[in-house]
Amino acid sequence: MSDLVCLACSKGHYIKADKESIRLIRTYVKENGSTNEKERFRAHTELFDITESLEKYLTTFDVKPNFPLHDLEYLMNEPARIVIENANKEWDVYKHIIDIYKSDKQFSDIFTLLKKAKDEKRLKGDHAGGTGEIKDTVDREPYMVESKNIRLKKTLALFDRDTDDNLHYDGNKNSLFKFFSGKDYTEIKEEDIYTLNQDEPFWHMWYKRAIENYFPDVQYVKAGFDVSGIRGLTLEERDYKLLGGNKTHPALIRGYKKDSVKSLVNGLSREQLERSLKKFNIDGMEISEMQLFLLKMVRIL
């Protein structure tokens, strides 16, 4: 038992238990733990003191007496993963966003925990190689327990909207919508996507067309790109134009290529992002889309 308790310590997990169980755990580690395990146990001073806010957003596992210990070890040890269609180009962007939201006033303790997980490589980006590969990547290397893939509890999928407005959903993503929500793309609603009440695997689709639409003009200019092609656009037009281009359409921002997306976060602040974000009512609280996306990351830690 001491090795599992200390694994929880080293991986930043928490244990919620009654006083007698906590006493037994402390005694067991003291009497049976190795020197290294005892040091890790002492270092994680908040192991039994999870805050209400952290408990609200972290996923809780009810460990009953018959819960297989090797399955528990897997859940604690397996890195949380975000399946991204362009992780090889975009993961650095999301790591930067995690960094700048550490000082978020609403969720400072929660996003501090998220940053720590990212820094310790307990959270990783998993490259899907395109929208069509997302489902296969999500299902890759399953860990089956009683016919259920519990690796999905540690998985969040992210993909672009790819539509010209916020009124429609992309029919080319119909298989994804059915996989994640059980609904056809003609039936999907905002509350199916922009919520924390999702069954695993958790998922998020950008409210705007793609991640490129979230960066203000000044970030493109700072990175050396020509934004004259998008000047004069309304805010809504800018949110849904194909700014970065694709195989058949040139980028509206001259000189920009997908490989350049990492350069757009240089000097980017949380305040810059927040100015143009859609707000959602989550559990009676108004939060931005980026806060919601980060909270989904927290759910899989």
What are these model-derived regions, one by one?
Residues 1-46:
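Interfaces and regulatory segments of ATP-dependent nucleotide/adenylate/phosphodiester-chemistry enzymes
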Residues 4-5, 9, 17, 69, ...:
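Extended hydrophobic/Leu-rich segments
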Residues 29-163:
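RecA-like P-loop NTPase motor core
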Residues 97-105, 141-146, 176-193, 297:
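Hydrophobic, Leu/Ile/Phe/Ala-enriched alpha-helical segments that form helix-helix packing faces
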Residues 137, 214, 218, 276-279, ...:
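Residues that form generic nucleotide/phosphate-binding pockets
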Residues 160, 164-269:
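Activity-critical C-terminal alpha-helical subdomain
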Residues 262-301:
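Hydrophobic, glycine-enriched assembly/anchoring segments
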